[in-house]
Amino acid sequence: MGSSIKINSISIDLAGAANEIDMVKCDHFSMRGFVAETRERDLRKCWPFSEESVSLVDQQSYTLPTLSVPKFRWWHCMSCIKDIDAHGPKDCGLHSNSKAIGNSSVIESKSKFNSLTIIDHEKEKKTDIADNAIEEKVGVNCENDDQTATTFLKKARGRPMGASNVRSKSRKLVSPEQVGNNRSKEKLNKPSMDISSWKEKQNVDQAVTTFGSSEIAGVVEDTPPKATKNHKGIRGLMECDNGSSESINLAMSGLQRRKSRKVRLLSELLGNTKTSGGSNIRKEESALKKESVRGRKRKLLPENNYVSRILSTMGATSENASKSCDSDQGNSESTDSGFDRTPFKGKQRNRRFQVVDEFVPSLPCETSQEGIKEHDADPSKRSTPAHSLFTGNDSVPCPPGTQRTERKLSLPKKKTKKPVIDNGKSTVISFSNGIDGSQVNSHTGPSMNTVSQTRDLLNGKRVGGLFDNRLASDGYFRKYLSQVNDKPITSLHLQDNDYVRSRDAEPNCLRDFSSSSKSSSGGWLRTGVDIVDFRNNNHNTNRSSFSNLKLRYPPSSTEVADLSRVLQKDASGADRKGKTVMVQEHHGAPRSQSHDRKETTTEEQNNDDIPMEIVELMAKNQYERCLPDKEEDVSNKQPSQETAHKSKNALLIDLNETYDNGISLEDNNTSRPPKPCSSNARREEHFPMGRQQNSHDFFPISQPYVPSPFGIFPPTQENRASSIRFSGHNCQWLGNLPTVGNQNPSPSSFRVLRACDTCQSVPNQYREASHPIWPSSMIPPQSQYKPVSLNINQSTNPGTLSQASNNENTWNLNFVAANGKQKCGPNPEFSFGCKHAAGVSSSSSRPIDNFSSESSIPALHLLSLLDPRLRSTTPADQHGNTKFTKRHFPPANQSKEFIELQTGDSSKSAYSTKQIPFDLYSKRFTQEPSRKSFPITPPIGTSSLSFQNASWSPHHQEKKTKRKDTFAPVYNTHEKPVFASSNDQAKFQLLGASNSMMLPLKFHMTDKEKKQKRKAESCNNNASAGPVKNSSGPIVCSVNRNPADFTIPEPGNVYMLTGEHLKVRKRTTFKKKPAVCKQDAMKQTKKPVCPPTQNA
């Protein structure tokens, strides 16, 4: 009779225990089981230990004092029992009248029985407990078991603890190892002994009653499936939790120990025993009900409550069944009928067997059944609920994907996997590790598959680090639907083994993409979710048709760069290993698959060429810029197969940030101008990109169809191969860009295009990036300018640019003169896609076609343009400082004005010096190679500007400074920008600016400042020729504006200063006080001279 008193802490008074009898102490003593028993028998026993008990511990060096036999029950683990068997019952301290209960008291656990048995002093009676396993088939009725328990324990309370209780715990604790034990199988498979015969065999009743607490106690690590025990013993077992089992395991090294549950309060334990009676034995139906109730406690989809309850019951029963079915059907029955007995299910949940309604990522029913059957020796022997659920008999009405996989799958890993149910239809992309191409199960019924993860992904909960980093590391990127034959592709087209089953989706499928019910392939996706092109570095599963649907709802869809992929990751394995491994597991096959496809071979070549490092840098820069609209479309730039792995190893960018505003990830193959999209594509709004046979870029459709969160997309152009069409104009692309002439550009030839401020030039890394989409730049740069391509070092002919592009290692700065957009030749150092300064006409406050030409802008150069101070949202000067927003980059025809360098802006020049590299094309002084003598040297820093001319000397620099025709802002050691006058536009030009644009207006200095600069330079000329040289016409000005840029500091680099610069700056500070300095020097010299004279 359980006490109504709730005990939060238990202590046992063993006063005088040492005096009563010789005892054998067990290190594995279960305090919990003991207290449960003693608490039942005598509430007074539960008191703090006395000092005498402490002395016992000291004497025999046991962690816990043993209990005196007359008053307390013996608790032994297997090792203790073995020792008792070896030494005889007297060692146990048992009374002579006690009979060997070893035959009956066997409790099975993991091929060994961790049961405490009172061994009779007669050694012939003692037998191995495992050999003496309770040989009753689970088929024995609970009533019989109860009877046996009652008869077996007469002295126990009026109601014996039913075997169902044992079974309940055993069901919780039964593990495949336990049941899998051959001996247990043999024993369990044996026909159950008659209760009468068993009683006869167990003639221990009186012996047990002779001393109240010496009843059999099965302190089992994992309580056996079914053992008739004293109700007290059972209560002890029930209440022991794993305290005893853990302690027992300490001795049982051979056994695999598991924690079954958290430790419950004794009050709960007592309350459990209190309510548990041997007579009221619950059948499996009751067990199912209880478990279902327990299942209801879990979070469930509203429509899935019933199914989830069944599944929960199944989860527990089927798991136990699956684990116990190997050994015997009876075990499963016992396990099923048990565990419900505990009234406090909520707290009693076995953590290991917790029935969770979070569903296993929906493996196909077949796979789930197989997974279960793997551990279920005979599914037909399962308990009815589990059996019905898996075998189809009495099948619970649940969608096929909802069936549970093995319970081995770690629940905490499963918790994030609930099916997304949209309009009652969810497509589950589920694939087991063995399945090469994941099967997509579209279920019209409520699908229990990987809901939580997709929700979280869609909600952006889990996307932040794990998902995005994983995507980034794995090279997953969102890709626009490529429009083949101007037919919008609304469904993911799978390769042979693609992860999503392609369906002929209606054009309006994306339109209604918010409701996943319309697209079977994307059904599991939430509204606004893109179907993402799942492409690893080597497996570009993307076809021309492999569509990355543009996110219609950026907030939810932003993090779902590869939601389907991620879901696959989750679905592939119920555990995180599956998730983590998913990418890896599926890398190889998809990669080969993508390469196997002819359609994607060209895309693969181009898409793979783009390294993730660029994306990472851009994301990092974007983050540092703290732009509210972090819409850097560091879009699905899949690292080239070669560079992808490197990029994985490279910085992992949080794609969540890069995708923060739901920026559609654009395929890196943006190098080609978008092909006009069909009306269907417009209707669908998934922005299928027109696709050129060899062109590798997918461009979004023209601005009218671009969602507002997504930046402007250049209008589609028909003549894409040789030139970029910006806003419907023939804006030539960079010579070496893949769209120009490179059918198969190397990854280095690509650069990520971004807002002008992001433009940076990093040597040897080029990437045509998807257009950086800036919400502020949403205005389509249509028909503002018709760029005329200038090929400074090469012919202005766009064809020549494309030819020049063939040599990726020899980029020459090519500028589109009309737009002032710079066309970078293949020379990787100076490949700049900066179009900002030149692109913006004075009339328009924003760069022309910032995004239209972004595809042509090298990614690293774009990164170099990143300035954390600058905000991309500034309308005039997205890439520049807001204070420059009013500044307009004059069109090509205004190049003279730039040359003249209006002095009105000199007041801002000090700031502009920092901004100079950014304000031009991308607020960065981009150097335009002199057509002949201008040596193009790769700037060490990605964002560093390098202005170098063939030869330059301080004298030349002085001459330049004296000239007033044009002042090029040079990063002198002075804090203020030094504008070196130069008559040769070609010699000194801003990188990213066309010939027409020498400098932004803001860099113009007032005459006064010019004079000051000249004076400063003259002062420093003699002292430090280096900084003065920087102001010379052939200037080497390398400024690293990109905080993400990790490069060697170069002269003139504002952020990366060398010691030389520091020295110069110090001198410059004193340059205006030469006389004072002289006086000070003289004074100092006089002072030291005086003391020696005095001393003399």
UniProtKB/Swiss-Prot annotation:
Motif Nuclear localization signal 2 positions after renumbering to this chain: 281-288
Region (Disordered): 155-189, 274-296, 315-348, 366-420, 563-612, 629-651, 1007-1032, 1070-1096
UniProt key word Cell membrane: no
Molecular-function GO term, any one: RNA binding
UniProt-annotated location(s): Nucleus
Signal peptide residue numbers: none
Disulfide bonds: none
Recorded superkingdom: Eukaryota
Function: Transcription repressor that regulates phase transition during shoot, flower and seeds development. Controls leaves development, shoot architecture and flowering by delaying both the vegetative to reproductive transition and flower initiation. Participates in polycomb group (PcG) protein complex-mediated (including EMF2) silencing of the flower homeotic genes AGAMOUS (AG), PISTILLATA (PI), and APETALA3 (AP3), as well as of some regulatory genes such as ABSCISIC ACID INSENSITIVE3 (ABI3), LONG VEGETATIVE PHASE1 (LOV1), and FLOWERING LOCUS C (FLC) during vegetative development.
Record protein name field: Protein EMBRYONIC FLOWER 1
Organism: Arabidopsis thaliana (Mouse-ear cress)
Lineage: Eukaryota, Viridiplantae, Streptophyta, Embryophyta, Tracheophyta
Gene: EMF1
